[in-house]
Design a protein with these regions (language model features):
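Short, small-residue-biased leader/transition segments that mark boundaries at the very start
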Residues: 1-3
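Short alpha-helical scaffolding segments that buttress acidic/His motifs in well-ordered protein cores
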Residues: 14-15
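Surface segments flanking catalytic/ligand-binding clefts of nucleic-acid enzymes
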Residues: 19-191
Length: 191
């Protein structure tokens, strides 16, 4: 029922979570991708979206948001200085720029973590990199501001209409009231 009744964003989150925890061996992925059953085309698309590297579900959503808005990103990008020394690893690198976008959860409000974050931000700035931090609220309700930041970093005109693709994906997922209602209706219909 999960594969048949869920949309790509939800399935992508499940795939990424299972991979991150080592619960989805390669042979099982191959089996899932090769068999035909209700929902298998959707599952195959979800595997295409699940590029790996996410350390949280919100990172997955942030990555899918960028890709839906036609922003090329690379997950878990390692940034080095001019000597090749490690500076930081960013959740999402906006390909072709010196900017990373990251999900900032509640852990970043801890005073000790906040000090580490500020030190890291200084290292990034010293090497000419910029960082944009976003919350779950931003991802769900302020996507156009994330897109605006990306457009600015890419040096392209801001087109807020590009966010519509993200809104369409989000609307069908369990991260929206509409997506939750779709699942409730599907469950009721199957009883």
């Amino acid at each position: 029922m999960c594969i048949r009744d869920r949309r790509e964003l939800d399935l992508t989150c499940l795939i990424e979570g299972a991979r991150h925890r080592g619960l989805l061996p390669e042979h099982e992925e191959d089996r899932l991708l090769s068999e035909a059953y209700p929902g298998s085309p959707r599952l195959r698309r979800s595997f295409e979206w699940a590029t790996g590297g996410a350390e949280s579900i919100w990172e997955v959503l942030l990555r899918v948001l960028h890709r839906a808005c036609e922003v090329a990103v690379e997950a878990q990008h390692e940034i080095v200085d001019e000597n090749g020394d490690f500076v930081a690893r960013g959740d999402l690198w906006l390909v072709g720029t010196r900017r990373i976008h990251e999900y900032d959860g509640a852990v970043h409000q801890d005073p000790r973590q906040h000090r580490k974050d500020l030190k890291r931000d200084r290292r990034l700035g010293a090497t000419g990199w910029e960082r944009g931090g976003y919350t779950s609220y931003d991802v769900l309700h302020q996507a156009v501001s994330i897109l605006r930041d990306a457009d600015q970093a890419l040096g392209r005109p801001h087109d807020p209409a590009r966010v519509r693709a993200w809104h369409a994906i989000l609307k069908q997922s369990l991260f929206s009231p509409a997506g939750q209602q779709l699942l409730r209706d599907r469950i009721r219909a199957s009883l």
